[in-house]
Amino acid sequence: MTGPWTLTPRLDRMAPTRHHHAELAALWESPDARLLVVDPRGGVSTEPFGQPTAEAGGLPGYDDQRDVLLGRTTTEGREQVWFARRGDVEQGRTLRESTFEGAELELVTAATAVLAWHDSARYCERCGAATEMAGGGFQRRCTGCEREVFPRTDPAMIVAVLDDEDRILLGHQAAWPEGRVSILAGFLESGESGEHAVVREVYEEAGLQVTEARFLSSQPWPYPRSLMLGFVARAHGEIRVDEQEIAWAQWYSRTELDAAIEDGLTLPGQGSIAGRIIGAWRAGELPAPEGALRI
């Protein structure tokens, strides 16, 4: 299964540079420095994508309490250093609304996630004092007890559940618009492996017993700070949805799904791991869950 998240990252995150204010300030002044302004929805401007830092509004120069160093990209031999900040964007497009690819996908995902974390981490969880940005924007430090905290990522599994006839299970969440379906997903609990989360969530949401599960790939999803762990699984039993989170679910053959789509059923977009997993199954390219390596 292929997708926009490749093994080799396009974004060099420049972690060693984050703690050197003078270097960050010099990078900001570089003619190759670019700024992504991200609105509270996660929307960014796409026409153009990013702007020279020299054209950024507000206070001049790099501000270590406002600007986040995302890292460096190289496109067609040209290097650019990218920063991000929270702000207003006219007609901004989010990851859900646009199909970003390559370096742009990594930049928007990182910016959306880290700025959402800053919005929610302004006070210390230990003593309640205000925190301040540090580490080039990938750290916060408490002004009271000096505790240092870092951006959190919440792991979640997402799974294509197949039956013995190679049909796929698709469910409709109660909060979704009518006709929208996807594969099952859920957050990992404390001390739980991804495979165990697959077994638990499939049983809780659909009443099915998983007998095999295989890891496929992962995708960061910054709404607000998830890392989606993609699986394919084999399950048996009678579908029994919880009717709270999942309103209904059913098995689909490829022919049945094609017909349902013609009748108005909607699937996740190909920019999401859910859409790519479903697409791989429809094309007959999804690996079988049997034979997964156990270590």
Q: How should each PLM-predicted stretch be described?
A:
Residues 1-121, 132, 176-181, 242-295:
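Nudix hydrolase/Nudix homology domain
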Residues 109-162:
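Cys/His-rich short segments
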Residues 132-135, 207-216:
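Short, well-structured beta-strand/strand-turn elements
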Residues 140-182, 187, 209-210, 214, ...:
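N-terminal strand-loop-strand
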Residues 192:
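Surface-exposed, charge/polar-rich loops and edge strands
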Residues 198, 202:
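Hydrophobic alpha-helical positions that pack around
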Residues 219-240:
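Active-site-adjacent beta-strand/loop module that shapes the phosphate/pyrophosphate-binding cleft
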